[in-house]
UniProtKB/Swiss-Prot annotation:
InterPro entries named among the record's database cross-references: RuBisCO, RuBisCo_large_chain_AS, RuBisCO_lsu_C, RuBisCO_lsu_C_sf, RuBisCO_lsu_fd_N, RuBisCO_lsu_N_sf, RuBisCO_lsuI
Reactions mediated catalytically: 2 (2R)-3-phosphoglycerate + 2 H(+) = D-ribulose 1,5-bisphosphate + CO2 + H2O; D-ribulose 1,5-bisphosphate + O2 = 2-phosphoglycolate + (2R)-3-phosphoglycerate + 2 H(+)
Binding site for Mg(2+): 201, 203-204
Annotated compartments: Plastid, Chloroplast
Naturally occurring in which organism (per UniProt): Lavandula lanata (Lavender)
Positions of substrate binding: 123, 173, 177, 295, 327, 379
Official protein name in the record: Ribulose bisphosphate carboxylase large chain
Protein's gene: rbcL
Length: 473
């Protein structure tokens, strides 16, 4: 058939390339309650109009490709295409725009974070017409949320399992993160739990290495949990990292944890992947295990201000995929995190309904329609002097996790745990009495030092430790 010969299917079809904005930029579009809405920070290449850049994002993340294809006529593009419906310049930034894109719900497989991200961010970030692209926020409609199980248990169920109310939970990451034998590792777990912590934790890269195979670690940690529970009368846990090279191996480790009767397991959800995470979350709900989530690799995705994906999007995705805890930054420790922005995505993790608030980075009102909440975990370079600020910032429904801030105590692990527990109890009591933790925090800690030599020793060691660096560009 010669190139000039028309077929029946090509009647009305005009081959060639046309501007994306002619099809995918629709400023008159009124969004639907069932649409997934995305806010992209777009930096076009020189000479590319923002309308064309926004339309290109909508096209390449939905039904579009670089040229017109005759099979467009075999479906309804108006029904399935993404639409760039609004564009705002970013104040104070040259040639940056917030482009809002609406996606019809039919584009996405039910209950699949993997498919949602494959569509929205899977291909478009390498598009040549863009110098940079960042997904700032997503609005997940209730109709789509209802296709997900979400967290295995949620905040209230975890409180009931631990029988612990009215205060933040305390944790500790065992250090050194790599190199300990399973028996010595279990010893450190016992000492920290016995000293007053609620949880201890495998670090993100503790899986099953030659110096400590996973089964040995699970056994010694279970022994530490039961021994500390018997001696304190409190329910304890250790985040046993079930992350593995295959989904089958991951589930096998979770099964063994359940057989040991421990309360919680752990997963590295970004390196492990959303499909694996959702599978593990379903197993945990069915078998009564809490699920702690580590966000290892997140800064590769979210740290650049004009390219990648903001952590609030990863946090929303985790709430859909499933996890009872997730690391959220500290605001005050060694890892980056602005207070208002951090509290914005903390609310998105915990609350059932969150109003749009651009000052906190929340681009859309989000209704979670009773999907269980996720407890934020503050971790990274924190110590007893930070306790008042952490208690005031994160409130009761949080885990405050001190690794070096426990194990680095000059008297050893148990006094380190005691110091953190005393500092927390002092801050909670002061708050309940109506004192201002932000203004009186240091005084509250100093008062508690008078009747806790363990806390006094910790305060002396870390009194000058700060992590203050200029904000990133």
């Amino acid at each position: 058939m010669s190139p000039q010969t028309e077929t029946k299917a090509s009647v009305g079809f005009k081959a060639g390339v046309k501007e994306y904005k002619l099809t995918y930029y629709t400023p008159e579009y009124e969004t639907k309650d069932t649409d997934i809405l995305a806010a992209f920070r777009v930096t076009p290449q020189p000479g590319v109009p923002p309308q064309e850049a926004g339309a290109a994002v909508a096209a390449e993340s939905s039904t579009g490709t670089w040229t017109t294809v005759w099979t467009d006529g075999l479906t309804s593009l108006d029904r399935y295409k993404g639409r760039c419906y609004n564009i705002e310049p970013v104040p104070g930034e040259k040639d940056q725009y917030i482009c809002y894109v609406a996606y019809p719900l039919d584009l996405f497989e039910e209950g699949s974070v993997t498919n949602m991200f494959t569509s929205i961010v899977g291909n478009v970030f390498g598009f040549k017409a863009l110098r940079a692209l960042r997904l700032e926020d997503l609005r997940i409609p209730p109709a789509y949320i209802k296709t997900f199980q979400g967290p295995p248990h949620g905040i209230q169920v975890e409180r009931d399992k631990l029988n612990t109310y009215g205060r933040p939970l305390l944790g500790c990451t065992i250090k050194p993160k790599l190199g300990l034998s399973a028996k010595n590792y279990g010893r450190a777990v016992y000492e920290c739990l016995r000293g007053g912590l609620d949880f201890t934790k495998d670090d993100e890269n503790v899986n099953s290495q030659p110096f400590m195979r996973w089964r040995d670690r699970f056994l010694f940690c279970a022994e530490a949990i039961y021994k500390s529970q018997a001696e304190t009368g409190e329910i304890k846990g250790h985040y046993l990292n079930a992350t593995a090279g295959t989904c089958e191996e991951m589930i096998k480790r979770a099964v063994f944890a359940r057989e040991l009767g421990v309360p919680i397991v752990m997963h590295d959800y970004l390196t492990g992947g959303f499909t694996a995470n959702t599978s593990l979350s379903h197993y945990c709900r069915d078998n009564g295990l809490l699920l702690h989530i580590h966000r290892a690799m997140h800064a590769v995705i979210d740290r650049q201000k004009n390219h990648g994906m903001h952590f609030r999007v990863l946090a929303k995705a985790l709430r859909l995929s499933g996890g009872d805890h997730i690391h959220s930054g500290t605001v005050v420790g060694k890892l980056e995190g602005e207070r208002d922005i951090t509290l914005g995505f903390v609310d998105l993790l915990r609350d059932d309904f969150v109003e749009k608030d651009r000052s906190r980075g929340i681009y859309f009102t989000q209704d979670w329609v009773s999907l269980p909440g996720v407890i934020p975990v503050a971790s990274g370079g924190i110590h007893v002097w930070h306790m008042p600020a952490l208690t005031e910032i994160f409130g009761d429904d949080s885990v405050l996790q001190f690794g070096g801030g426990t194990l680095g105590h000059p008297w050893g692990n148990p006094p380190g745990a005691v110091a953190n527990r005393v500092a927390l109890e002092a801050c909670v009591q002061a708050r309940n009495e109506g004192r201002d933790l932000a203004a009186e925090g240091n005084a509250i800690i100093r008062e508690a030092c008078k009747w806790s030599p363990e806390l006094a020793a910790a305060c002396e060691v870390w009194k000058e430790i700060k992590f203050e660096f200029p904000a990133m560009d």
